């Protein structure tokens, strides 16, 4: 999260090969310095690459799955867990919207707010620390903008770290 505090520095943490390809191409075209953080457990990830599609620009999240009951917001490797969680919830007749942030700076506040205002519930998945983290910022955005509609408190789930 400390990288997000550096003025003018863009930060990308893509989960999908197509996003990594297009975000890297966008980074080459802009004047802002950009940091790409690739999760090593995503290196063997395969997927369709559409070279003709320009892809979404920095600061635009990708809604991987539309839903109406809960918004699951994440980035990088945890997107895989978000998608699995949505599949499990679907078996329980719970419709989860999955949002892949793709870039953490600029952060797509509008997509987060719009989704949570629609679903009225939010789960933020991350591998980071519990405090002073990206999920802390996302939770803050949700509370500042959606507190009147929330049916339950926002849940932050942090993947256990191995150290």
Task: Give each language-model segment a name.
Residues 25, 32, 87-91:
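Charged, amphipathic alpha-helical interaction segments
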Residues 40-163:
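Thiamine diphosphate
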Residues 1-30:
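Conserved thiamine diphosphate
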Residues 27, 31-33, 138-142:
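Glycine- and acidic-residue-enriched helix-capping/beta->alpha junction motif
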């Amino acid at each position: 999260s400390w990288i997000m505090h550096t003025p003018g520095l863009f930060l990308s943490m893509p989960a999908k090969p197509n996003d990594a390809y297009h975000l890297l191409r966008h980074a080459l075209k802009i004047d802002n310095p950009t940091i790409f953080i690739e999760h090593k457990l995503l290196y063997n990830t395969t997927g369709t690459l559409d070279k003709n599609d320009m892809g979404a620009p920095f600061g635009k999240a990708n809604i991987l799955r539309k839903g109406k009951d809960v918004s699951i917001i994440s980035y990088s490797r945890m997107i895989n867990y978000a998608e699995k969680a949505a599949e499990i919830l679907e078996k329980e007749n719970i419709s989860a919207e999955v949002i892949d942030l793709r870039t953490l700076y600029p952060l797509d506040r509008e997509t987060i707010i719009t989704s949570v205002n629609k679903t009225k519930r939010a789960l933020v998945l991350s591998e980071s620390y519990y405090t002073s983290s990206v999920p802390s910022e996302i939770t803050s955005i949700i509370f500042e903008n959606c507190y009147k509609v929330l049916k339950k408190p926002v849940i932050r789930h942090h993947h256990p770290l191995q150290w």
